Amino acid sequence: MNTALAQQIANEGGVEAWMIAQQHKSLLRFLTCGSVDDGKSTLIGRLLHDTRQIYEDQLSSLHNDSKRHGTQGEKLDLALLVDGLQAEREQGITIDVAYRYFSTEKRKFIIADTPGHEQYTRNMATGASTCELAILLIDARKGVLDQTRRHSFISTLLGIKHLVVAINKMDLVDYSEETFTRIREDYLTFAGQLPGNLDIRFVPLSALEGDNVASQSESMPWYSGPTLLEVLETVEIQRVVDAQPMRFPVQYVNRPNLDFRGYAGTLASGRVEVGQRVKVLPSGVESNVARIVTFDGDREEAFAGEAITLVLTDEIDISRGDLLLAADEALPAVQSASVDVVWMAEQPLSPGQSYDIKIAGKKTRARVDGIRYQVDINNLTQREVENLPLNGIGLVDLTFDEPLVLDRYQQNPVTGGLIFIDRLSNVTVGAGMVHEPVSQATAAPSEFSAFELELNALVRRHFPHWGARDLLGDK
């Protein structure tokens, strides 16, 4: 046990009291992202070190690892606390998404350290999908780069509203206020094109030296703002899902014996209470909530983000992938939607292709009807393309094999987020965020069946010399 943790437990009056205090702290999930070698892993290592979250054996191991793999000369290489893969240590880069946990007296934190290299952008999107705040690192010597713009856009696309622009390595530019101001203005010019109402803050720091990370820097008297840790401890996070209508995707039908039948899952948004009238989609059958069962016993009500099991008063047909919502809410099932896609496979996404998709516990198939545009990350302009390449981001039209109940991703990430799965390899090849569900009334009927369209795409891809025409036409 490290000395800081031991002191906290002693101050709280014992382990049990300390654990209760931890449960009542708010939790902030954030990620670090930016271009390669901007110091993301070093920053996380510095946060863990300066908040005294490192155990003595870890510190001893870090001294030894710094001698073998370190890139900071005689100094401790704090990035090694996070870069766990052997390939990462040998190359001095981050490849996988690394998660770390730490806490202070004010708040608990879960950190996702994401890769900076462009070829690992898909890993970065994975890390951002569960976060509420993004720390965007910028090398003070290089300024705003393409990968900085890419990560900023992906973060906002995935619903992150709080951006902290950490201008790192200020020690290498002599802690220049002019450099900080120039980069700040450059980023704000770019950020004006980002979607949504964003909370953007700027902190000049040196992760290697510890300036403005957990304590105020004496080398930058011109900066009077908060340190990075103070920003993380005080930022107010308003969860969108709390104010949204009730959504409960069924993940598992729990029937341990003949006397109990419950529907387990995580409440995606809103709240549910005993006695509430609920409706099951897509069947439309209604019932009342008889019990809300949790690990700690029965509850009278539950809120977004809580894992619960609902018991209904009636025995009705409900299976994995069904959605429960308030009975008085009208939410029609749709068979088409426009989806913002981050593509993660070497094989490009092309019109006519079909994939398995998973959304809120539901698994079905979807066909790509067309690609409206791909976003140019450098200037956020939209351009027409025939396919979406690896790490490409664009708006895609999908048609599903069966009606689905969808929300816009910005309203509800659970019922609006989906993944694409290759049907042969079973590998996840893309992430999608529902931009707009297309109602049945406005969806244009297809002249051809899903099988005919898929066969047509297969023939055109593998036998182009046959000259088969595109059945999708101008779609």
UniProtKB/Swiss-Prot annotation:
The region called G4 is annotated at 168-171
UniProt keywords (A-Z) are: ATP-binding, GTP-binding, Nucleotide-binding, Nucleotidyltransferase, Transferase
| Residue numbers binding GTP | 34-41, 113-117, 168-171
UniProt keyword 4Fe-4S, yes or no: no
Task: From the UniProt entry, list the residue stretches annotated as the region G2.
Answer: 92-96
Q: What does this protein do?
A: With CysD forms the ATP sulfurylase (ATPS) that catalyzes the adenylation of sulfate producing adenosine 5'-phosphosulfate (APS) and diphosphate, the first enzymatic step in sulfur assimilation pathway. APS synthesis involves the formation of a high-energy phosphoric-sulfuric acid anhydride bond driven by GTP hydrolysis by CysN coupled to ATP hydrolysis by CysD.
The protein's organism comes out as: Escherichia coli (strain K12)
Report the CDD domains cross-referenced here: CysN_ATPS, CysN_NodQ_II, CysN_NoDQ_III
Q: What is its EC number?
A: 2.7.7.4
Q: Under which name does UniProt file this protein?
A: Sulfate adenylyltransferase subunit 1
